[in-house]
């Protein structure tokens, strides 16, 4: 489906989705570790639906009521699972399946099969988990001979490290060495989830996992900072909108909470309400190694700012849901921005603003970024593939309609 966006204006409080980084970990951890829980304040994103399907195939009884998910576990190894396009569910499930001794066939979306897996495969195989690449490009798992050894894990993706933390938790505890750990903030999300599920995780160069014996049976899932970024950017760029957020349940564990530091001069906090104040006075810098999900929305600032945006270590963006490096360059150029590339970092600043016409991306974060840029530009812009935002933010366009003219395009 295609939506048409024209201009910005309006005020309101953005209803943010729950953090799928937390939700997927809670769902998968609950069923594989046999910890029955109730998750509150949950928005069912596309990725969450994938994790729930895996949980049900592994014997969980799932009851959903409004914004709560009740998970009652009775673990059994699934004969097959479907991971869709969710890298988090795929990678974490692979570790848990191997640790649990399962023999499981894995299917998923072809685009996910293209993403890197070698460091995780090597770590699991070092523990005698047998992995075989199937005809769909996914790894089938045979954990019937899996062991608990002290191994080394390449932390080029935090999901590889998180998968192995879950692996050792399922084994009753253990430790392993990590080298080259990037995006450590997401590993701390895993630490928090496992603490709530009854495990102590100590994160140093060597990561140690031990059971605590006590876990929470009811857990409140916090809203998502990476989703907040899109409306924060719109509020920064447009004086015609008054954007607010309710931050009552938001901690600083999520790595994308760095937004509160990056834009501290543009944020007013009154009790549980965060209000965005417009205006960009300096160059904005974001590191793709640490905050890859912030790069698409932050890049929109560069389109309209004379100070510009710097995206460091952009190579990380080439292996996300799409090649976001190419997507960001395309989007910025279509709006007339000046884009410079030094081979490692990307620089975007305002040029002669122009009408981009129709923008078409398949990556959920690129679609939402393009929509925000369209609203800030004042042009009438068509955005294709709007349904794909359900992967992380099902209500995005409904929320955007509080601050921009949004309509279905014929």
Curated annotation (Swiss-Prot):
The active site is at residue 293. The keyword Transferase applies. It is found in: Cytoplasm. This is 3-phosphoshikimate 1-carboxyvinyltransferase. Keywords: Amino-acid biosynthesis, Aromatic amino acid biosynthesis, Cytoplasm, Transferase. Its EC number is 2.5.1.19. Pfam families: EPSP_synthase (PF00275). Its main location: cytoplasm. It comes from Thermoplasma acidophilum (strain ATCC 25905 / DSM 1728 / JCM 9062 / NBRC 15155 / AMRC-C165). The keyword Amino-acid biosynthesis applies. 3-phosphoshikimate binds at residues 20-21, 25, 157-159, 183, 293, 320. Catalyzes the transfer of the enolpyruvyl moiety of phosphoenolpyruvate (PEP) to the 5-hydroxyl of shikimate-3-phosphate (S3P) to produce enolpyruvyl shikimate-3-phosphate and inorganic phosphate. It catalyses: 3-phosphoshikimate + phosphoenolpyruvate = 5-O-(1-carboxyvinyl)-3-phosphoshikimate + phosphate. Belongs to the EPSP synthase family. GO terms for cellular component: cytoplasm. GO terms for biological process: amino acid biosynthetic process; aromatic amino acid family biosynthetic process; chorismate biosynthetic process. Monomer. HAMAP family: EPSP_synth. Phosphoenolpyruvate binds at residues 20, 115, 159, 324, 365, 391. GO terms for molecular function: 3-phosphoshikimate 1-carboxyvinyltransferase activity. Pathway: Metabolic intermediate biosynthesis; chorismate biosynthesis.
């Amino acid at each position: 489906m295609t939506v048409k966006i024209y201009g910005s204006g309006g005020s309101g409080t953005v209803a943010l989705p729950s953090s799928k980084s937390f939700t997927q970990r809670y769902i998968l951890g609950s069923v594989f570790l046999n910890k029955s829980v109730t998750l509150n304040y949950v928005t069912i994103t596309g990725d969450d639906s994938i994790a729930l399907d895996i949980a049900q195939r592994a014997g969980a009884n799932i009851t959903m009521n409004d914004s709560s998910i009740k998970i009652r576990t009775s673990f059994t190894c699934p004969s097959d699972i479907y991971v869709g396009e969710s890298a988090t569910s795929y990678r974490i499930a692979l570790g848990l399946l191997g640790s649990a001794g399962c023999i499981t066939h894995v299917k998923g979306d072809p685009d996910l099969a293209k993403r890197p897996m070698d460091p995780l495969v090597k770590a699991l195989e070092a523990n005698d988990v047998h992995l075989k690449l199937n005809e769909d490009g996914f790894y089938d798992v045979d954990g019937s001979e899996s062991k608990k050894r002290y191994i080394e894990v390449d932390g080029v993706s935090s999901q590889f490290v998180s998968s192995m933390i879950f692996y050792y938790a399922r084994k009753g505890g253990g430790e392993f060495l990590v080298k080259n750990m990037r995006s450590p903030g997401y590993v701390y999300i895993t630490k928090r989830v496992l603490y709530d599920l009854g495990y102590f995780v100590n994160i140093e160069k060597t990561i140690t996992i031990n059971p605590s014996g006590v876990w929470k049976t009811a857990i409140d899932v916090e809203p998502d900072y990476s989703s907040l970024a899109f409306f924060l950017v719109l509020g920064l760029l447009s004086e015609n909108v008054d954007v607010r957020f309710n931050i009552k349940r938001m901690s600083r564990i999520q790595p994308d909470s760095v937004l509160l530091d990056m834009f501290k001069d543009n944020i007013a906090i009154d009790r549980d309400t965060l209000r965005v104040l417009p205006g960009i006075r300096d160059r904005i810098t974001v590191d793709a190694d640490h905050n890859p999900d912030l790069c698409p929305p932050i890049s929109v600032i560069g389109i309209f700012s004379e100070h510009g945006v710097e995206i460091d270590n952009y190579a990380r963006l080439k292996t996300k849901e799409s090649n976001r490096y190419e997507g960001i360059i395309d989007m910025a150029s279509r709006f007339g921005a000046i884009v410079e590339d030094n081979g490692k970092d990307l620089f975007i600043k305002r040029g002669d603003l122009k009408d981009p016409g129709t923008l078409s991306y398949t990556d959920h974060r690129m679609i939402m970024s393009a929509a925000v840029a369209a609203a800030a530009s004042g042009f009438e812009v068509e955005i294709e593939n709007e349904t794909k935002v359900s992967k992380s933010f099902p209500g995005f366009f409904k929320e955007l309609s509080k601050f921009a003219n949004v309509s279905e395009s014929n």
